[in-house]
């Protein structure tokens, strides 16, 4: 089957629902495991690469995709319209958009990044503004899933402490520098969550199913 490349971040956007063999598979598996409702906000939509993994796992949430880069959504629309389900795109700054929301979300995915000196890092807003704002915009059983990146000026412990707003689980990888932080009252304890995250990833067919490590925060 053909696959198409999302040029902005050089991550593959599948032409059909299925695994990405990237950190998106873990994030999609966390939605499948922990989501308790139909409303999902995706801050940093880019080319929508995570959507294929979500739909392959049977996640049918209504997705609000937010990004200042609209060309990625155009690419996504051109190859995913037949299978992507309900996806609405907002070309807007993530902080401004989230502040305007009056209805709470069941899931917020924070996947923002910026280029800095040839590296891809977290923007200031992901560290200083969004953590508390996202916590205010989820339901009582809602979850926040953050894709963390090595960022100059922040050790991992400091970065994690600044974006963490409640109980959660941190996922680490053997082949990626990223770390995924899953927060919320429905996340559960690490042994239980790890077992079912890996199960979801095996069902998805993700190559990362055997290389994740989890710890409780």
Segments predicted by a language model, with ranges:
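The AdoMet/dcAdoMet-binding core of the Class I SAM-like
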Residues: 16-141, 152-160, 164, 170, ...
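Short, small-residue-biased leader/transition segments that mark boundaries at the very start
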Residues: 2-7, 140
């Amino acid at each position: 089957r053909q696959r198409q490349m999302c040029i902005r971040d050089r991550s593959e956007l599948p032409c059909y629902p299925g695994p990405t063999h990237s950190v998106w598979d873990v994030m999609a598996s966390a939605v499948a495991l922990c989501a308790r409702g139909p409303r999902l906000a995706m801050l940093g939509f880019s080319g929508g690469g995570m959507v294929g993994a979500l739909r392959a796992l049977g996640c049918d949430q209504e997705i609000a995709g937010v990004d200042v880069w609209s060309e990625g959504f155009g690419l996504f629309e051109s190859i995913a319209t037949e299978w992507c389900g309900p996806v609405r795109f907002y070309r807007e700054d993530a902080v401004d958009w989230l502040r305007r929301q009056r209805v709470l979300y069941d899931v917020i995915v924070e996947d923002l990044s910026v280029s800095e000196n040839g590296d891809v890092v977290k923007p200031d807003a992901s560290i200083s503004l969004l953590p508390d704002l996202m916590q205010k915009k989820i339901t009582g059983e809602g979850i926040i899933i953050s894709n963390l990146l090595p960022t100059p000026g922040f050790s991992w412990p400091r970065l994690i402490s600044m974006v963490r707003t409640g109980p959660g689980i941190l996922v680490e990888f053997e082949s990626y520098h990223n770390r995924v932080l899953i927060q919320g009252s429905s996340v559960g304890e690490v042994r239980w969550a790890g077992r079912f995250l890996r199960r979801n990833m095996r069902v998805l067919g993700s190559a990362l199913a055997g290389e994740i490590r989890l710890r409780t925060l």
